[in-house]
């Protein structure tokens, strides 16, 4: 690809990402879509509404992703998550630290960006610290600690670490077909679970589930 065409494509991708992020932020702000808020509502009040929003969004994203993979528009095997080594300790420690930071920072990364757009100065400070910490964990001093500790613990799997890899290996069908089948079962199940509750059937809840899931696609 010539440099001129590559530059033009880069600009298109950046503008598309900007527009999608604007839509994502607007929907999040309008519907109060929030991962930490969903968990907090369930634990504190027994209210599953925002958790159902989250479940529907995941279901829509799963189905859309599998359709793109089945059609050949994307290659899931090239994702950084499609590895043959399962870093289970890294996932546990990282998940715990993410959850802890989400509570202390009053929201995850996406919610922090939405709050910055609303003029929240605390969110701006959280965003700066989060950016520095993330970069350090990828390529800085904490990356050395990460590689020397949690990433030394893992399990090598011949068929890959994703459910699609396992299903394809067990059934003998192509990975794209296995992925499509799994997404329809799991993703469709999540959408059904979310929408079966009568109290959930409100336009804003559907906007959150379908809109956020669509933005992810």
Stretches found by the model and what they are:
Residues 1-217:
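Membrane-interfacial helix-loop segments of redox and metal-homeostasis proteins
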